[in-house]
């Protein structure tokens, strides 16, 4: 079969186009070449018997050359392969597919002979054509296309690397005679391309072994055992119409898949370096130190909890650097033990934290599911029938569990009501007045201009509101200057100071207005804000009515002694009155002291139960931290209650609030408050410990 080297070798080689000197015969004279690539059919000439005349000089030339390069030449040169198969070609010193391919003349055989020649394993030369057969010429025409490629390739037998001693000896025996007769330089060729090696290795089982000859089909043998080439018309058009490289293409794929890369210029391309993971590094370290660590299966760990600790898995105990003295055996064992203890403690700590996170996530998911189910009930059943269902037991239980955020603002507005009959248009009127006042304050800010203003007007100044707004929920960064709700909060507070100049602005109002803004629209938030501050308890505190404030403190102490008598006596021993911690809680409605989500839940029940729940929540906080407060003195108690811990949860707080009984000898909050008010009017101050001070 012919390859790309074969086509390149014989392309353009024609005795008529390019004159080539004829080969030298035994007598040193130029022998005219015969034949050529004219495409004519060549009839095989039967080999002569012993004693007949010698072969023509060109045939001797080729016979000597091929004997040195690939074994003895077939005597017939017309497709006889028996003698060629008897002598194996020496590997490395024989011709490659690029050398012998151009010696193949046009295939004029039939399909059966073509298949036989493809499985032969050694190229067979066609015999020189007879005179007058398909335009074949004499000896010059036959030898010219063969001699020129041989001279251009400068082929000669090289050293052999075949392990077969017989082939090496037989090939080396004829090297000297071939070189002397041809006069060609010594050129050593191994495998001229990467495909030849694979062809020799992969097609070794197809080659006939030494001493055997490939039998020819009977149909292709002429009389007397000679080989006859079938006549076929056609020239180079038929030659190039065939598929020249089907076998080479298949072998190329096998070479590419079997080898890591092409070996170009004697260099093998480096392999791609794989990045090492932490597990590979740890395995290499354990293999180097001779210690194996049994890693627990990851699947079982993931079944227990979703959070897999990862920080300690990358800790690797390394030896000392080479420039430092090596560790002793005892020291290495001690360090190994300390390392294992450190890793074990870190694992326990991470597992504990992972369990805690998992528990928090479960509680959060459970709460979200309950809120989602409650939202459907509130939207579809309760809100459409608010006046009828607001006092039912089912609604009160849902209310206690917390309102869904999507309906919280609506429920707050309905629960607080609008006794003042404030409309959005009225809010716009008071807002415009507030803007005019701020403008006048900015234009005239001297002390002489401020002397004639009332106390409420002074507290309604722009500077005081700005200062308090900047301290409202500072962790959220939404009410400060430049935040999305800064202007809205500023407008509501300014409009309220114009609406209630008798109350004005008091520190703590900004937190109440901010919580309403987060759940309501601007106008609705102002309406709820004004009605909420109009309640008796809030009005007493924000107007700083000391007599009313003392009544609320006295009523609170009655229930404090009833529910937490031990803590009540502890506070009395330090002379700690409720005003130290209750003022901040009541002024801001716990929105400053508690986390925002927990404060909103307190607001939910406050809208249902009124001012009573504010003081009940205070008792619940004292009950929650009763054990801690009993161990503190006056200063630490005041500091602790002023700034409560941030990790307080709604479940714990509301469980403590539920344990507080707001009854004193069958008297409820309103009844106790009325009795305390009556006692104050009569001048009896002995019933309230707060009033004694």
From Swiss-Prot:
Region (Disordered) location = 1-57, 91-120, 156-229
- UniProt subcellular location: Endosome
Is this entry keyworded Coiled coil? yes
Gene Ontology CC terms: autophagosome; recycling endosome
Q: Which residues carry this modification: Phosphoserine?
A: 202, 233
> What GO MF terms are annotated?
GTPase activator activity
Q: What happens when the gene is disrupted?
A: Knock-down promotes neurite outgrowth in a RAB11A-dependent manner.
The record's section on InterPro entries has:
Rab-GAP-TBC_dom, Rab-GAP_TBC_sf, Rab_GAP_TBC_domain
Q: Basic and acidic residues bias: where?
A: 106-115
> Could you tell me which residue ranges the Rab-GAP TBC domain spans?
402-610
Where's it mainly located?
other
Compositional bias, Low complexity, is annotated for 40-49
Give the protein's biological function.
RAB11A-binding protein that plays a role in neurite outgrowth.
Q: PANTHER family from the xrefs?
A: RAB GTPASE-ACTIVATING PROTEIN 1-LIKE (PTHR47219), TBC1 DOMAIN FAMILY MEMBER 12 ISOFORM X1 (PTHR47219:SF15)
| Name of the molecule in the record | TBC1 domain family member 12
Species this chain originates from: Rattus norvegicus (Rat)
State which gene encodes it: Tbc1d12
